[in-house]
UniProtKB/Swiss-Prot annotation:
Highest rank taxon of the organism: Bacteria
PROSITE patterns in the cross-refs: AA_TRNA_LIGASE_II_ALA
The protein's name: Alanine--tRNA ligase
Presence of the UniProt keyword Ribonucleoprotein in the record: no
Higher taxonomy: Bacteria, Bacillati, Bacillota, Bacilli, Lactobacillales
Catalytic activity of the protein: tRNA(Ala) + L-alanine + ATP = L-alanyl-tRNA(Ala) + AMP + diphosphate
Length: 872
């Protein structure tokens, strides 16, 4: 077996499959493009679903890739086991309706065992297979595999919802008896016992059925095109080929671990626990690559995952004695390890370091707050004479402050308290159930549509015309091809068309189809790409249409021009964002409609009003500069050499279309555009908002809509000016500010009067002192305007020794407000209010010295006041 670096393994994999006629699919962005069913790209096949479900036909049906992936369902196991990772690389080879079982197994065995390639010892390889899949068993035997090395497993059948499914066969490497201390042997595989001896290195899925959840597996229909989908983990291959005990001792992780050793002064022991080293080395890879691909730490979705990974890594850094920000110092090391195939981390090093360091600094403040919260919880336990920290409190520390359970346990036990592990697990399960319920259901490859996939007739989109005559090639009605149609809805393909199919954020054209007499025979309501790339026109049929007949196709020209204004303005906006807020502001999505444009981009904070003003100004400057817009076709590399912006994660063909706006903007784009920027007329940003962690959205209008937006603003300003009696529009802001200042003065004066009135009333309230259980208390209903006045009462009460406890109740509108204040350690205000509030159909809580609650049943106020004596 050859001893290869991870980079050599990856390259040899790709080279082998290229020698078998495969094309290399570049690794896609970790943030899925146009796939709302996935939080992250989580496998090598995830980016190829469009090929497997038949919605797109690939240029080459043989594909290979090395795909970075993230899975976060096992975060807690990372560092505890030898092979769990959040980010990993899947090496894959795929056949879309081309070769099948014989080639997949035969070539796979060749790659693994040939001296020209990996050169694995044949006697170290074991294979599992689906018991009913005798063909795979026989193919392995034909390759020279001993029957004793073939293990039938009932679970070796791959399916996920509706769509492609079939048996799979897994390949394992036997690391020998040293990793089998109980000498269990092959039963470890046959009985699926967790072990470190037999390492799964490759899975070959034989997709030959269309799974249908409504019928038994035996009734699944054969796929019109059978597929091969395989995945081999680079980290596991590296561990085996480098003779590493775990994945973490490979060249993918050890350079990171060595840097952590330097930062911590601690030493990594291959035979020791090393959990903290492993957690940091794993999490930093996922964190940096995700940020490089446009995701940013936040409080939801992908952002929450990244924040959790970073905080877990920071806490493990502290366990190693690293109490300063340090993760950002690992960016260079991670980037250098992966540079040969993934240069993006080093290319974006400064930006990634900035984001990670800022997030670490924020978390340092959060840790201080969390420590304070834990101290309060432990103090409360002591006051209440309890010895166990409740699970819900542990979960809050874990979920809100990022405290690992083991850290909470360590600190609590140091203080002499136990941990409610079962309560924590229950709280964790509740959150996981909520998360699962909120997930967008998906992940299935989808059923193949044989009718659409069978369209092979050529069709060409003509960019530079709004009307043309063309022959009708294909009619599909009721999901079947037909020669003619006279009513209802149908899908049409023409030899050529002026209708743009929805793509790249630009909406489809609409329009009409006319016969040779000039009569409208169909209305085009939508245009999408067929699996083989032809524009597929969805039409409402008004009169007879037949294949082979020529028709005149006319798009809605006015609508197209409005869409083009917005699309061209989107390119200007993208360039302006780069210039004003930074090159990290890359496109995360766009929509170019007739009425507006919407542009989503990566950015870690709200765009300020001043920045928006600069962006808007810069775009309009380019419009007024009347820049010439040119489009050319070339290959991707030439386009990039010209400085063309390519959307990261987007797949491009051999020939790409380059749209250049003067010397200001150059982008790869397949959409339609104006001839000159001046045709946009005017550009106006109407909204900027956050739509998720690390993603901002700008909505803007152009042309007539921009003029209307400005006029509406002017009308509103005129109305305000008239209301505040400003002599001119430019004076309106000053008049509004003056009125605001006057209002603030009146509010301050009113508050002072209320405070004096409350102080006067307090004198009467504080006279009525009662006593119970040796505690002096005041319990009274007061007439106040708001809850703030109750706090003013409490502040006055604190100044003198009126009593030990104060309970005030006020009916304000339809709500009952309750305040409890305590000066004695014998009475916990927060606990007391929890007993009193339910009496008035309310709830609340607070600190030992002050607590408030809200209720809704004012009829029970007297009952609440009477209950005070029992609760002190």
């Amino acid at each position: 077996m050859k001893e290869l670096s991870s980079a050599q393994i990856r390259q040899m994999w790709l080279d082998f499959w290229k020698s078998k006629g495969h094309c290399v699919e570049p690794s896609a962005n970790l943030v899925p493009v146009n796939d709302p069913t996935l939080l992250w790209i989580n496998s090598g096949v995830a980016t190829l679903k469009k090929y497997f479900d038949g919605s797109v036909i690939p240029e080459n049906p043989r594909i290979t890739n090395a795909q970075k992936s993230i899975r976060t369902n096992d975060i807690e196991n990372v560092g505890k086991t030898a092979r769990h990772h959040t980010m990993f690389e899947m090496l894959g080879n795929f056949s879309i309706g081309d070769y099948f079982r014989n080639e997949a197994i035969g070539w796979g065995f060749e790659l693994l065992t040939s001296p020209e390639w990996f050169d694995f010892p044949k006697d170290k390889l074991y294979m599992t297979y689906y018991p009913d899949d005798k063909d795979s068993y026989n193919r392995w035997i034909a390759c020279g595999v001993e029957p004793s090395h073939l293990v039938p497993i009932e679970d070796n059948f791959w399916e996920i919802g509706a769509g492609p499914s079939g048996p799979d066969t897994e390949i394992f490497f036997d690391r020998g008896e040293d990793f089998d201390p109980e000498n269990i042997g092959i039963r470890l595989l046959a009985e699926d016992i967790e072990n470190d001896r037999y390492i799964e290195i490759w899975n070959i899925v034989l997709s030959q059925f269309n799974a249908d959840p409504a019928v038994p597996r035996s009734e699944y229909k054969e796929l019109p095109n059978k597929n091969i989908d395989t995945g081999a983990g680079l980290e596991r291959l590296a561990a085996v080929m480098q003779g590493a005990k775990t994945n973490f001792e490979t060249d993918l992780f050890m350079p990171i671990i060595r840097e952590v050793e330097k930062l911590s002064g601690k030493t990594y022991d291959p035979d020791g626990d090393n959990m903290s080293f492993k957690v940091i080395a794993d999490h930093i890879r996922a964190l940096l690559f995700a940020i490089g691909d446009g995701a940013l730490p936040g409080n939801e979705g992908r952002g929450y995952v990244l924040r959790r990974l970073l905080r877990r890594a920071v806490m493990h850094g502290r366990r190693l004695g690293i109490n300063e920000t340090f993760l950002y110092k690992l960016v260079l090391t991670v980037g250098q390890i992966m540079e040969s195939y993934y240069p993006e981390v080093l290319e974006k090093r400064d930006f990634i370091e900035k984001i990670v360091k800022r997030e670490e600094e924020t978390f340092a403040r959060t840790i201080d707050a969390g420590s304070g919260h834990l101290d309060s919880l432990l103090a409360q336990l002591k006051a209440e004479g309890k010895d166990t920290l409740e699970g819900k409190d542990i979960f809050k520390l874990y979920d809100t402050y990022g405290f690992p359970v083991e850290l909470t346990e360590e600190l609590a036990e140091d203080a002499g308290y136990k941990i409610d592990h079962e309560g924590f697990k229950s709280a964790m399960k509740e959150q996981q159930d909520r998360a699962r319920a909120a997930v967008v259901k998906g992940g299935s490859m989808g059923m193949q549509n044989e009718t659409l996939a069978g369209i092979v007739e050529e069709s060409r989109f003509e960019y530079d015309t709004y009307s043309l005559e063309s022959s009708l090639s294909v009619i599909i009605a009721d999901n079947e091809r037909t020669e003619a149609v006279s009513e209802g809805q149908a899908l049409l393909v023409f030899a050529q068309t002026p209708f743009y199919a929805e793509m790249g954020g630009q909406v489809a054209d609409t329009g009409r189809i006319k016969n040779d007499k000039g009569d409208t025979v169909a209305e085009v309501v939508d245009v999408q790409k067929a699996p083989n790339g032809q524009p597929l026109h969805t039409v409402n049929v008004l009169a007879s249409l037949s294949v082979g007949t020529n028709y005149t196709l006319e798009i809605n020209k006015e609508r197209r021009l409005a869409v083009e204004k917005n699309h061209t303005a989107t390119h200007l906006l993208h360039a302006a964002l780069h210039n004003v807020i930074g090159e990290h502001a890359t496109q995360a999505g766009s929509l170019n409609e007739e009425e507006f444009l919407r542009f989503d981009f990566t950015h870690f904070e709200a765009v300020s009003n001043e920045e928006l003003r600069h962006i808007e100004q810069e775009v309009n400057e380019q419009i007024w500069n009347a820049l010439t817009i040119t489009t050319t076709e070339t290959d991707v590399e030439t386009a990039k050499e010209r400085g063309a912006m390519a959307l990261f994660g987007e797949k491009y063909g051999k020939v790409v279309r380059v749209v250049q706006i003067g010397n200001y903007s150059v982008e790869l784009c397949g959409g339609t555009h104006l001839n000159n920027s001046s045709e946009i007329g005017l550009f106006k940003i109407v909204k900027e908002e956050g739509i998720g962690s690390g993603t901002r959205r700008i909505i803007a209008v152009t042309g007539r809509q921009a003029f209307e937006a400005y006029r509406n603003q002017e009308d509103a300003l005129k109305e305000i000016a008239a209301t505040v009696k400003a002599p001119q529009l430019k004076d309106a802001a000053a008049k509004v500010q003056a009125l605001s200042d006057s209002l603030r003065d009146f509010q301050k004066e009113n508050a002072e009067l209320k405070e004096k009135a409350a102080a006067a009333a307090a004198g009467d309230v504080f006279k009525d002192v009662q006593e119970a259980k040796g505690v002096r208390f005041i319990a009274s209903q007061v007439d106040v305007a708001d809850a703030g006045a109750l706090r003013t009462f409490a502040d006055n009460w604190k100044q003198k020794d009126y009593s030990d406890v104060l309970v005030l109740v006020a009916a304000i509108g339809e709500k009952v407000n309750v305040l409890v204040a305590s000066k004695t350690k014998d009475v916990h205000a927060g606990n007391m209010i929890k007993e009193l509030a339910p009496i008035v159909a309310g709830r609340g809580g607070g600190k030992p010295d002050m607590a408030m609650a809200g209720g809704s049943d004012a009829s029970k106020i007297a009952e609440l006041l009477a209950a005070v004596a029992e609760t002190v």
